[in-house]
Structure formats: structure tokens, C-alpha cells
Amino acid sequence: VFAKEQKLVDVKPAENFYPKISTQECDSNCLLELLEARLYLSFLSEFVDQHDQFLSNIYAKLLNSITDFDKNLQKITSVKLAIIIPEKTIKSYSNTIINSSIAYLLSQRAEIKVKVFLTGTEDNHKIRSTLEQVQAQGYQYAIAALTLKGVNQLKDYSGDMKIFIPTLHKNNVSFSNLNKNIIFGSIDYDAQVLALLNKANSDIAAFSDGSMLSSNLNSRVLEQNANTRFYRVEGEKLDFYRLLRSQGSLNNASIFLNTPLIKTALISSQLRVYNIQPFVLLSTQINYNSTFLSLTQEGDRKNFILANSIDNHDDNLSYLNEIFNQSIDYNWIAYATSIGTDYFYTQFLNTKSDSLFDEKIQNSQILYKVRLMKGSKASFEELK
């Protein structure tokens, strides 16, 4: 059913695989072949912990529901999905994208072969050679976890294979005349910033930590308000007194916290310690996480608004992602990847199936709603 591979090598088709009795241990490749051949009971009997989280999660799922797992599978033949991963570039997002794709296909009982192509980096020759290999092996649909550097290698792409890029928004691409078969899936940070500014006053300030994402968010705020004051927080220690002396008071300011969750919690608590009363605290998707509720004080959250574009309604999909140790309800990369996989599956691979999502695709970009949220005692609630 699923073939997750770490090398760009050909895999024998399922119909040519025949298990043989052996006293030798079934290694990771052997276990993956058993999965591809739908020999689930053989997989369970041969499974030995390989310190492979992917295989361990599948083992747990099969162990709990082996009867239902193979029941009423969609009978689709010769259907394949490629996943292109520059693992040295996107690092931890690699597993997120692979796992969310597989979790979605499991939720649909889809009999689809998945193959992962690792490119290492996004160098021009590696992206191009991988695309050629993917197409040569007959794949018509691919999820490609590319950054802007990788997408720049697709300027001249003219193939018929449909490519979904969950990691980038189309607005970030500077060149025009992009192949219509390339679709973008990132959330829209510009739309989130605009929605948050509707809750702000004219005195805008922003905190950052110097990271690429933080700097990117700062630039988006600055585009909307040229008078924004910036406060940079680096390292583990926060010298709040020095920041205030150098940049001025934050009383009655609308403060964007373009910082990771732990620093956001620290900054919000320091505002309280220094008896600073902002007009409002604001954050984009970067801080929309269940951990936000435990790291911040309830009093600090009363005047804190977060923008969120994740709107998952499928409990089974949430459960399957949790098996892979990730949350589709808070991880926008997992959510975007799931929407892209859903698009391929329901629009092309199995048109009789229903989409699990409300989002639409327009001009080669997923359109997301922006919901403004507040953290209560134990959950997030949408502002009305």
C-alpha cells in the first residue's frame, strides 16, 4: 500500500512479491515491502523494533485495527503518489509532510502506492534530475516540499505531472508564467496580518528573534504600517529593561509577537511584570498551538488575539496524525499537505470520494479563511 523509501531506487511491484520462510530478521526494507504487498499479518509477525518511528506507528495502528484496516479498500489500480523531499533543507518538516500524506490516505482507505524521493538539497541539478526520475517512473502527482530556492528551479517546468507545494504561498514567487500544474498550499501570512491589524490601533510594535520566519513576519507588518517599532530578542535571556529604554514605552501599543512560543510566553509575562498595559497582543499562526494555553497565564491571554487558518473537522484524520506524533489541528504544514493530498485524491485519483476539507483552490493557490482566536482556560475560541 505504502512504500516509504530512503534511496532513489526502484521497488519491485507488489504483485511480484512473495514472502518466503526465513530465520533471518526482517529489516526495515523487508517490512516496507510487506506493507506494500498488503501482507499486514506477516508485517505484524515479522516486526522487530527498528528504531523507525514510521514503522512503529504503522505497527501500532495495525495491531489495534488489523481487521478494519484492510476492509473496503478503494480498488484503484496503478495509482501512485510521489513525495519529493529536500531533507537537508526542510529538516524536521520532512516527516511532517510524509506522515500527513500517509495519514490522509489511510483515512480514505486508499490503495495508493506512495514513494518518497529524497533530494538532499534544492540545488538545480538535484531538483531537475529528481523530477525527471519521478516522471520516468510514471508518477502523475507529486507533493514537493520546496522552499523559494527549490521553486525557482521550476521556472521552466513544462511537464504534465501535477505538483503540489505545501510549504510556499504563490505570492512569494516573483516570476510569472508558472506552469498551471504547479499548485501552492501555504497559509497566507499577509491575510493574517491584515486581519490582526483590524483589531489594532495606530501605535504598532513588533517583537522578533532574528529567525527567518520572524524577520519575514516583521516585513509583512512593516508593509502595512511603515511606523512600526521593532524589538529584537536574542538568546535565552531577555533584558526587557534595556529594550524598553532603547525603544520606548509599549503602553497602549498594539504588539505583534513574531516570536516562537516560548519567547512569546516570556515576553507576555514580562509585560505584566513591568506593569505595561498594551492595547492588544497579536500573533499569526506561529503561536497557534495547544501548548500556548499551558505556557501563558490566563490573565495574559485575555488581551491576546491569534490568527488561525486551520479548520479541520475530521476526527479520524486528527487521530491518524496523532499516531504519527503530530497534530493536524495545530501544525499548518501537516494541514496544508493534507489538503493537497485530498485535492489529488478526490479530484483525480478517486473522483467518487468526498473531500474532507472546505478550502478551495483558485489561481493555483489554496484559499484559506482567517479566523481570529482567543485562548480560554483549556481551548481556543473564535472571536465573533
Where do the protein language model's features map onto the residues?
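Extracytosolic ligand-binding ectodomains
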Residues: 2-384
